[in-house]
Amino acid sequence: MKALTTRQQEVYDLVRDHLAQTGMPPTRAEIAQRLGFRSPNAAEEHLKALARKGVIEIVSGASRGIRLLMEEEDGLPLIGRVAAGEPLLAQQHIEGHYKVDPSMFKPSADFLLRVNGMSMRDIGILDGDLLAVHKTQDVRNGQVVVARIDDEVTVKRLKKQGNIVQLLPENSEFQPIVVDLREQSFTIEGLAVGVIRNGDWI
């Protein structure tokens, strides 16, 4: 399958989501309206491009004649090693998909992150575990978060006071990471909501 352009991906996502929500694909006019195209003909051109790339099939003679061919992966994306400067959920970081029900976690998990190291050992997060993560930036002091400092991704307990963030380990052999928000790039990628070890939720 050939890679999709950003616009083609938007059209594909719209068709997929419309199917999931209503049970039928959108019309060309609906696609044009939702994505700001000037006419349904522009939507038709994008659909033809998607058909050429093998991700949809256009069924002639029907205003909603669109069939998805590209199978969506089941389960939660598993994030492995993250390259510097790239989004955590970039396609190249996804090692695979893990068949687990996101709703078994509260709040529900959006992705899994492979744990690297033993800095959170004392609360049962071990090297090689799969950490279930709810994607959000709405977190509170004391919660275990997935954070990005400059280009490093880490799992720690959050303590924020003014412009200073401390990321606290749960292992006395490790030192806290101190971040000055005035000098360093800092992003919360999500909230830890559970751990999977050897295929079992614990």
UniProtKB/Swiss-Prot annotation:
EC code: 3.4.21.88
Top class in the EC scheme: hydrolase
Catalytic activity, reaction form: Hydrolysis of Ala-|-Gly bond in repressor LexA
Gene3D superfamilies associated with the record: Umud Fragment, subunit A (2.10.109.10), Winged helix-like DNA-binding domain superfamily/Winged helix DNA-binding domain (1.10.10.10)
Location of the DNA-binding region in this protein: 28-48
UniProt keyword annotations, A-Z: Autocatalytic cleavage, DNA damage, DNA repair, DNA replication, DNA-binding, Hydrolase, Repressor, SOS response, Transcription, Transcription regulation
Example GO molecular function: DNA binding
Catalytic residue positions: S119 (for autocatalytic cleavage activity), K156 (for autocatalytic cleavage activity)
GO biological process: DNA repair; DNA replication; negative regulation of DNA-templated transcription; proteolysis; SOS response
Protein family per UniProt: Belongs to the peptidase S24 family.
The protein's assembly and partners: Homodimer.
Protein name per Swiss-Prot or TrEMBL: LexA repressor
